[in-house]
Amino acid sequence: MSIILKIKKTDDAKDLPLPAYMSEGAAGMDLYANVKEEVILQPGEIKLIPTGIQIELPPNFEAQIRPRSGLALNYGITLLNTPGTIDSDYRGEIKLIVINLGKEAVKIARGQRIAQMVINQIVRPTIVEAEILSETKRDEGGFGHTGI
């Protein structure tokens, strides 16, 4: 399935590349940091990092914003609300809530690949209140019910 994803760069991001897939089988396209100056993220610090893009998704689609595994593993940099959800009717700039969970300060430079965006189709079910739910073998077994 193929859809059209319209992407508009903000006025201060015209020099940055559009989001791009880095391999043939990549599920997510990389997003770039649209910072005017290098940002220093201290251990435990949270900052809002703009991407310089706005998107237009078709109805019944969403964009999930996810961390990049290399930044998480090597530097402890991740997104605080992951995955972040971009709804199809949102037209503002995509911004990232970035946190440094590492032990060292990390620099975020303009144009650095900072997160990835995955496009998903969504289903909006009809909600029906129920008094009884069907039983299953698992039933109400929750956290750790299959062992550790």
Curated annotation (Swiss-Prot):
InterPro entries: dUTPase, dUTPase-like, dUTPase-like_sf, dUTPase_trimeric. Its EC number is 3.6.1.23. GO terms for biological process: dUMP biosynthetic process; dUTP catabolic process. The keyword Hydrolase applies. Its cofactor is Mg(2+). Keywords: Hydrolase, Magnesium, Metal-binding, Nucleotide metabolism. This is Deoxyuridine 5'-triphosphate nucleotidohydrolase.
